[in-house]
C-alpha cells in the first residue's frame, strides 16, 4: 500500500489533451504543476525541505527523516486547488515510452522461528535499526518510533500488522527488479536470522488469529482501525493479516492509460488465480485459494472493486478524479498529526467544507495521500498499480511484474489483450473477480475454464517480453507450470496439508520461508 514515487519532486503536465465529458480540454505546453497552484512536494521525495517537522540529524552515515507524509509545511499554497488541477495532477504522470519504468512492491510476514508467532513491534524496531546501521538506510520516524527506512528511491515500510514491505525503485528491466528483490531479502535475512526471525511469503496469515497480531504505532492506522468495522466485516483482516505483491507501471497518454486500465481490470482475476496463495486461516483450510482476494470484497465497497465505469466511453482522468472525490477520506495530515476525516469526502475538502478541518483547503500532498487510501483491483495515481496478487516466495515476486510488463508494455500485445476481453460483460468480469478466489483457474468461463483463457494470456505475456529484447521471459517460469496444470500454488499447499504435513499448517512457515 505504500506510495512508490516514480520521479523527483517537480512534475510537469505534458502538452496535449485531457478529455472531458464537456468536450476536450487542452493542457497547454508543459504546464508546470509547481507553477499551477502551489509548490508540490512528493511524500517520498528526496528533496524534502522543512521547518520543525523534518528534523534531520546525522549520526555517522545515517540520516533520520520524519514520518511520511510530513510535507505540508513545505507546501506553499498560492491559491485554492480546483478539480481541473487534480485532473492535471494525474495527467502529469504521462511519460514517453523510453521513460517507462517498473516498480515492484511486496509484503511479507515476519515471525519468531522458534514459536512461529508474529514479530512484535520492538523486534521490528530492532530489525529496522540494525538494517539501517549495517546497510546504510535512512530511518523514517513517527514521533520517537521508527516506522520505516529509505535508501535512494527504495523504501521499507510497515503495514498495520507489522507486515514488512519493500517499495522498490522505478527500474528499467525485470533483471534489475529481481536483483533489487534479492538484495533486499539478503539484507533482511542477514539481520533477521541473528534475531531468530524468519519471513513468510503468503497472501494471508495461515495460523494466528486477528487478536494475536501486533499493531504498528502509525497514526493513520489508528484511524483506519476505528473506521473499518463500520464499512465491512473483513477490513481489519485486510489490515492485519494480508500480504500482496504488486507492480506499478507507467502510461504515455490518457488514451494509453485507459487501455492499460481496462486490460488490467479484465485480467486481474487471472493474476489472482496464478498467484493464489492464501488457503489457510487459523491453522485450517478456509475454503478459498486466495483468502486475501476474498477479503477485499467485504472491506469497504466505497473504495474497492472492479470499477465498471472504467469501461465507459467517457472514461478518462476526469472520471477517475470524480470517483476519487467522492470516496470517503480517512485522514488529513496537519501539524505533525493525523486528523480523523473518516466519512467525509475530498469534494467537501475542495470546497473548504470539511467538518474535520473547517475552512481549510487541500494541497497536492493531501490529494496524493487520499489517492493512496483507495483500493480497487487496479489503482491510478501518476502511474498504475496492479493489485490482484497474493504475496508469495521470491520467484513469484519476480514473476508478477514480468506478467504485467509482458502484457501492458508492448503495444501489439496490449491490443491483443483488449481484443480478447472486448466482449466480456461487466457481469462476467464481476463473476470472475468473485469466483476466482474460490476456484482459481478451474473457474467456469463461457465454454470452458479460466485455465484456457490463462493459457492464451500467458502466451501473450511471453510474446510481450520477447519483443522487449531483454531476455526476461524466464521470469515467467514460476507461473508457467501453474497455467499448464491449472493447479494454483494454494492447491499445492492444500495437497501437502492433507498429505505429508498431517493436517498441520506449521510446515508452511518452512516451505514458504524467504
UniProtKB/Swiss-Prot annotation:
Subcellular location per the Swiss-Prot or TrEMBL entry: Plastid, Chloroplast
EC number in record: 6.3.2.2
Gene Ontology MF annotations: ATP binding; glutamate-cysteine ligase activity
Keyword Ligase: yes
Keyword Glycosyltransferase assigned: no
Result for mutant: residue 341 to S: Decreased activity
Transit sequence range: 1-55
GO biological process, one term: glutathione biosynthetic process
Catalytic activity reported: L-cysteine + L-glutamate + ATP = gamma-L-glutamyl-L-cysteine + ADP + phosphate + H(+)
Result of altering residue 356 to A: Decreased activity
SUPFAM superfamilies from the UniProt entry: Glutamine synthetase/guanido kinase
Protein family (similarity comment): Belongs to the carboxylate-amine ligase family. Glutamate--cysteine ligase type 2 subfamily.
PANTHER family from the UniProt entry: GLUTAMATE--CYSTEINE LIGASE, CHLOROPLASTIC
Protein name: Glutamate--cysteine ligase, chloroplastic
Organism: Brassica juncea
Primary gene name: GSH1
